[in-house]
Amino acid sequence: MEHQLWNAIVAVLATLDKPRNSVAFEFSDEDIVKVFYWAVIHDRPMSWAVQRRNWPIHLRKKPLPSNTTMSRRLRTESVRALLNALEQRVVVPQQPGLFWMIDGKPLSISGCSKDKQAGYGRAANCKAKGYKIHAIVGSDGTIASWRVAPMNKDERVMAERMVRTAPIQGYLVADSNYDSNKLHEACLKRDQLQLVTRRRYGPNHGTGHRKQSSGRLRAIELTENPKPAFATNLLHDRDEIERCFGNLTNWGGGLTCLPPWVRTHRRVHRWVQAKLVLTAVKRADCSTTYVA
């Protein structure tokens, strides 16, 4: 499996446009990305991937960058652009549908960690320290938009940021925690995007004296009218996002947890991005689909 994923990543990189660097480096941006993905595929730190003995025999002849070089180059704008281009090529849906789900998945770390950028907040039926991936997911498992934030960051705030730029339309289905006038307004501004969620405090509570978003009133009408079968089916199908998150973790090399060498937001974002790419490659059989 590791070699199939590696060959698929190499095939995709070969199809991407790679602008020339103004500075001559010993190792190209593509070389840096390949070494990085070799580490991520095997769930190993960068110091492991830069050692020749950890590569197949037929790939050991090529020189490898040092650990210091990897750390420095991964922060450069050109390498980050190539990582983003790889994500856009593989992860972003090519034919967006009309049904989308939104939720968050906790990425907990040790409570003793010194990571100052991690937050302490709600995880799965408990409190934990770490980060959380927020994602808008289609029914086929494709991810239209995602963000990584500290565990204590409000899911509704992250949802607003994703909705502003996500290439989606139709229905965005969420649990009651996403019931927010600001989020409904963000969906309205996108046009042809309706947030469907139950009221946060239940149908027996009023809407208060403040002005309500027309999108929120529409969601209340959909979920609380005498015949709410359509909204009920949408909310029932929202459970599919739990299986999508499960598919990120239930295979060797998936996004199971954050290893000890992945700390601070920059490294966590880069690690999660690579895991999303690998999961999409695995799902789409990229070794044959993306070859030019």
Q: PLM features: residue spans?
A:
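A short glycine/serine-rich beta->alpha loop
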Residues: P19-A24, H58-L59, W261-R266
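Short runs of predominantly hydrophobic/aromatic residues within well-ordered alpha helices
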Residues: S28-F36, I241, H269-A274
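DNA-recognition alpha helix
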Residues: M46-K61
